[in-house]
């Protein structure tokens, strides 16, 4: 928004008066953070954002008001949180994962929105391209080159012909990954076998439906699957189906290998975008995938 000279002088006078009356509150910045669900990858993003803010001198209780709410996997709750945060008028809202980002972007055209852990922000209709958006929306993508993922599958399970994937067909990120795998896998002599898990509680049954049909199960960062990863691991172990992931935390939880984003690093990059906004810089969009690869 452009401010004319007269308006600028008026606002400046008001700000000066507020600074004299309450110098601490006038300097305090406000950041509201929301995630669609709590699981290790998304929690790491949140913590990374805090790391970046602290490194830049912003600390909760001192010069920063920090809010965090999880939607607990519920899109309706995500929308409620988005409306609540917009009403609070923070300096920036950080939306972690596609459903939360979509909810926040739908709720405001004015408050700066920084998305994170979104695989394809264009397909999710958060931005029109990966160039500077020209809107109130920016962020950091966790998009990975799927050909590298396929190479990992071939390296770990050389004889694999059928690759299973459990995913939520209602999550835009996962739909994008499935479509790309359908194109890429045949070039390596493999095919994709899909199993839908619209809710986290559906992950185990979806995985069981793949028994006898696949040689390996690959997981992207589908939020339903990652939040219920242990149930997928149990099915994989019982059926002796190897699990290959696209986030490194899933290896700690039972996957045999992963080529993926370090989500703490992703959060730090996201936090640096927030810091730029707090300092009055222009919004921008970046693709962090190449900088945060971990095997």
What function would you assign to each model-found segment?
Residues 49, 284-295:
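Single conserved hydrophobic/aromatic residue that forms the stacking wall/gate
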Residues 166, 172-248:
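Pocket-lining segment of extracytoplasmic ligand-binding domains
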Residues 121-160, 261-281:
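Hydrophobic alpha-helical segments within soluble ligand-binding/sensing domains
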Residues 11-19:
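Bacterial N-terminal signal peptides
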Residues 31-50, 56, 67-76, 170-172, ...:
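Extracytoplasmic "Venus flytrap"
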Residues 22-26:
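Sec/Tat signal peptide C-region and signal peptidase I cleavage site
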Residues 66, 70-128, 219-237, 241:
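Beta-alpha junction/loop-to-helix N-cap segments that form part of ligand/metal-binding clefts
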Residues 2-11:
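Bacterial N-terminal signal peptides that target proteins for export
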